[in-house]
C-alpha cells in the first residue's frame, strides 16, 4: 500500500525522495505505478498516478486505481483521497502508458486478465491478452477531476468495412438419432444484435 519515489543522476545510484500512501483502495499489493502529466480542461497541468492493486479491485481480485494531484519534483500530493478506478470490470490490470505519441496523446495499455483466475486460463504459454489502447484525458465533473479513457482514434480504421444484416437464420442439425436445434438471429440497423439459442434433447 505504498509507492516510493527515487531519483538518480546515472540510473545507478539512487536517492529516496518520498513515499505516497496508503490511501483510497488498500488491503493488497500496490504495484506497476505510472506517473505522468496531463492538461485539465482549463489548460492547467495536473499529474496522474496510476496504481495497480491486488487484491482489492472494485470487481474482485486485481484492479487499477488512479490519483489526480500535483508533483513538485520530489513528492506526489493527491487532490483528495477518493478512490477512482480506471475500469469497473475485472479484466484490466498492470497498465502502463506511452509518451511521445502523436498529438501529445497519453496512450494506456493494460493486461486483460485478473489474478483471481489468470493461472487457470486454458493457454499453455501466455496468460491473457492486452487491452485495446486508450487515449487518457482529464475531465471535470462537479468540480472534481477524473481520468477519461477512450479507445484511440486510430482504431476507427478497423471499422471501415461494415455491413448490415436484417434477416433471421434458423437451422436444424441432425446427428444420428440425436437432434440439435440451433437458432441464430442477426439484426442490423445502425447496431448489430446477436442472439443465439441451442436446444439439445429438449434442453434450451
Model-derived features with residue positions:
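Extracellular glycan-recognition regions
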Residues: 76-108, 112-204
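Acidic, glycine-rich loop-and-beta core segments that form the ion-binding/anion-interacting portion
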Residues: 38-41, 47, 54-75
Amino acid at each position: 500500500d505504498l509507492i516510493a519515489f527515487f531519483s538518480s543522476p546515472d540510473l545507478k545510484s539512487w536517492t529516496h525522495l518520498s513515499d505516497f500512501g496508503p490511501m483510497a483502495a488498500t488491503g493488497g499489493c500496490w504495484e506497476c505505478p505510472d506517473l505522468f502529466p496531463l492538461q485539465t480542461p482549463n489548460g492547467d497541468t495536473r499529474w496522474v498516478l496510476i496504481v495497480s492493486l491486488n487484491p482489492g479491485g472494485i470487481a474482485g481480485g486485481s484492479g487499477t486505481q488512479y490519483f489526480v494531484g500535483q508533483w513538485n519534483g520530489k513528492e506526489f500530493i493527491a487532490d483528495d483521497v477518493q478512490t477512482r478506478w480506471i475500469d469497473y470490470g475485472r479484466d484490466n490490470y498492470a497498465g502502463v502508458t506511452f509518451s511521445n505519441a502523436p498529438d501529445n496523446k497519453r496512450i494506456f495499455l493494460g493486461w486483460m486478465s485478473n489474478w483471481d483466475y489468470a493461472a487457470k486460463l486454458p493457454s499453455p504459454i501466455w496468460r491473457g491478452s492486452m487491452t485495446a489502447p486508450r487515449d487518457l484525458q482529464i475531465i471535470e465533473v462537479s468540480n472534481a477531476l477524473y481520468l477519461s479513457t477512450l479507445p484511440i482514434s486510430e482504431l476507427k480504421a478497423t471499422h471501415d468495412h461494415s455491413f448490415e444484416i436484417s434477416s433471421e437464420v434458423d437451422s436444424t442439425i441432425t446427428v444420428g438419432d440425436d437432434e440439435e436445434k440451433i437458432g441464430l438471429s442477426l439484426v442490423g440497423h445502425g447496431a448489430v444484435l446477436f442472439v443465439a439459442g441451442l436446444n439439445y434433447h429438449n434442453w434450451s
